[in-house]
């Protein structure tokens, strides 16, 4: 299944291939939030040179989330082994929500602690990642590809997540 997240930022567009076959729960969560417009207008609230850029906090502080948490998904062949890896930011095991990060280079110390669920598609996408600074914005995020099968397989999770989202963000 070929799915691409397209993150339009104030610095340019980042195209990310999602690893939905290996991380279906994480990808379904990300896609669901994207389809609801959750990420649109959010900032990159944490940027560390030569390490990563992080966004997806509705408060812009790194302390917020969608109103629910879900478990990690680890795969032996998905590692933080290069620049451009998309992962879930978390506060420990089973605390994934909406915050994501994209690496500037290999970060092997994060393996087994953060779910890898995508990677930038090209050097030009990575150039945009490298140009992002704290406070830069995700203007609009959308998905390219057929999400129907993936989302149908995660319907029970989606129902739970969307109930929590409706409570926390009634305008989504």
Regions found by a protein language model. Give the residues of each.
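Cyclophilin-like peptidyl-prolyl cis-trans isomerases
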Residues: 1-172
């Amino acid at each position: 299944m070929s799915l691409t997240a397209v993150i339009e930022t104030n610095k340019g567009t980042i195209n990310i291939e999602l690893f939905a076959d290996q991380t279906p729960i994480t990808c379904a969560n990300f896609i669901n939030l994207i389809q609801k417009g959750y990420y649109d207008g959010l900032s990159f609230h944490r940027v560390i040179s030569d390490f990563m850029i992080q966004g997806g906090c509705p408060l812009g502080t790194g302390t917020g989330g969608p109103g629910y948490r879900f478990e990690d998904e680890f795969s032996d062949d998905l590692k933080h082994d290069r620049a451009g890896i998309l992962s879930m930011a978390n506060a420990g095991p089973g605390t994934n929500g909406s915050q994501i990060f994209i690496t500037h280079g290999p970060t092997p110390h994060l393996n087994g602690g953060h779910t890898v669920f995508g990677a930038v598609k090209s050097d030009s996408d990575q150039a945009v990642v490298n140009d992002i600074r704290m406070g830069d914005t995700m203007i609009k995020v959308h998905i390219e590809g057929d999400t129907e099968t993936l989302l149908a397989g995660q319907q029970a999770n989606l129902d739970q997540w969307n109930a929590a989202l409706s409570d926390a963000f009634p305008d989504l």
